[in-house]
């Protein structure tokens, strides 16, 4: 009954976890969402998120994960059970999977931000590079992987910002377009 009463509530708090399998070739990021920061910081809730993320490593999509058996019931049923116990809507928000020759990850303190990267080849210091690159992604929040993923609107806005900076530096107006691009 509690779960039914909470179904329409917004679950915008929670934890985000990244996990990589033992041979570093597959990884997941999942978010376990709840309604309040108070619940998100609760040890039992964080431990549930850890167990769910460990279990999630065996799946490549959210639907099969939610339909899978977990601690004697389906994951989706476990979330409803926890909603009834905790008294807040509990749900899986994001579920992302990656497979690659090498996968690295980073989880920022507090379990609010995580990132995961995959390399097409494994190399000697891939572990360090994977962690460092994942950390930079988490810190910088990039809009795309490369220039092809950036919308024309964002490109135009950034060009205008660069042109304004160049004007302030006293660059000639007729050169601004070429310099900014």
Predicted regions and their residues:
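N-terminal assembly/interaction segments in proteins that build large macromolecular machines
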Residues: 1-181
């Amino acid at each position: 009954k509690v779960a039914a009463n909470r179904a329409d509530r917004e679950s915008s708090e929670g934890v985000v976890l990244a996990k990589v399998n033992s041979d570093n070739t597959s990884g997941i990021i999942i978010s376990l969402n709840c309604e309040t920061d108070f619940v998100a910081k609760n040890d039992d809730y964080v431990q549930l998120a850890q167990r769910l993320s460990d279990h999630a490593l065996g799946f490549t999509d959210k639907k099969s994960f939610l339909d899978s058996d977990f601690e004697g019931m389906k994951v989706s049923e476990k979330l409803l059970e926890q909603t009834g116990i905790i008294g807040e809507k509990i749900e899986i928000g994001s579920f992302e999977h990656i497979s690659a020759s090498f996968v690295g990850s980073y989880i920022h303190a507090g379990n609010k931000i995580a990132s995961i990267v995959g390399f097409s080849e494994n190399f000697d210091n891939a572990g360090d590079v994977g962690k460092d690159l994942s950390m930079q992604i988490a810190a910088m929040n990039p809009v795309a992987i490369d220039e092809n993923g950036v919308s024309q609107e964002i490109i135009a806005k950034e060009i205008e910002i660069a042109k304004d900076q160049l004007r302030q530096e006293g660059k000639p107006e007729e050169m601004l377009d070429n310099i900014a691009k």
